Amino acid sequence: KVLITDREFHTVIEAALALLEHPPLVVDVDDPEYGEGRAVSALDYEALLAEGDPEFAWEWPDDEWQAISLNYTSGTTGNPKGVVYHHRGAYLNALGNQMTWAMGHRPVYLWTLPMFHCNGWCYPWTITALAGVHVFLRRVDPQKILNLIRDEQVTHLCGAPIVLNALVNMPEAAKAAIEHPVQAMVAGAAPPAKVIGAVEEMGIHVTHTYGLTEVYGPVTVCAWHDEWNELSLEERARIKSRQGVRYPTLDGLMVADPQTLEPVARDGNTLGEIFMRGNTVMKGYLKNPEATAEAFRGGWFHTGDLAVWHADGYVEIKDRLKDIIISGGENISTIEVEDTLYKHPAVLEAAVVARPDEKWGETPCAYVTLKAGFEGTREADIIAFCREHLAGFKLPKTVVFSELPKTSTGKIQKYL
């Protein structure tokens, strides 16, 4: 076992090592851009590489089903699980990325997506196989992202919608630095239509995908049709917010009744759960056979995401199964309410959760982070704005102004 770390984490690493009777080999990466902290080990990463034998006879896996890595779910539900990846799924999804995004040779890829998240959606392998350039970023900083796009001629980047939201809220002079086309792949909660439109105006083409840790990252894509380019910006943004169709490397995708597994009607209205199966689905959860069996009940992987199926085969998520609000017997999509909140000129970030209510059972409660200069915005202002765009029963009954807790990948932690 080898632990590779750097100065930023020296405090927690030293504390962890002190608890071990037999600590593993520790290797330090000395990042010149991070001058604080101290080295934990006397062995430097570059020195370790210099000790290597270029003629070493590597042992290849006996079969493609062998485990290649262990990734933990992000914990947005408060219960992270260890997801075991296999070699076949990893290389197939790496190929799926290239095919789906039509990436040519030698792309310049900016790591706005953490590499530890679903193995960086398999892009460490995709970009390397295409002889591309990896441009690394220690943390998401919108000004630095814009600078690197310009200076390194970045062609591709990935991440959660919050990354795009940070870019569109930069000063106009900073955004003007983008002078060449940039491809951005986003996943997670659907980007608000307003954000997609603003990013397009910056010269960044957004491809919306969807996936989970259990399926190696993105496995569906909102594949774009040329005729959609003739639509209005608002209509294009609405279409781009859909999660789309399956990757060519995913065997099966359906929206179905979570109990019977019967596919729902492709009418764009009937709710069901998204199910997947194929070679780009995990082996299972580490040392958790009960959770694995439940996740694959009926021979399909249960995502826990509620969606509708459109007539053209495109999937559109409406909410997490655990996030849907049931108020007076009516289902309320938190995503729909959040999308409305993002249209308010004062709202920087928003999350909607269920709040217990004696009369209705549950009502929507909105947590909102305001943009700089809009500190005078009141709860009544937000609710009045929503009333112009939503049915009465969907309105937030409570608005809380605060910073929103996030995971290390930028996802909002609603369960907190």
Annotate each language-model stretch with its function.
Residues 27-28, 33, 40-43, 50-72, ...:
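Conserved pre-ATP/AMP-binding loop-to-beta segment of ANL
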Residues 1-7, 149, 157, 278, ...:
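AMP-binding/adenylate-forming catalytic core of the ANL superfamily
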Residues 68-92, 414:
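Conserved AMP-binding A3 loop
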Residues 7-12, 112, 132-152, 161-162, ...:
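ATP-dependent adenylate-forming carboxylate-activation enzymes
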Residues 91-108, 116-156, 170:
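Conserved AMP-binding/adenylation subdomain of ANL enzymes
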Residues 246-275, 311-312, 373-379, 413:
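Conserved beta-loop-beta connector loops within the AMP-binding
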Residues 1-47, 372:
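Structural core segment of the AMP-binding/adenylate-forming
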Residues 46, 129, 154-159, 168-238, ...:
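Gly/Ser/Thr-rich phosphate-binding loop
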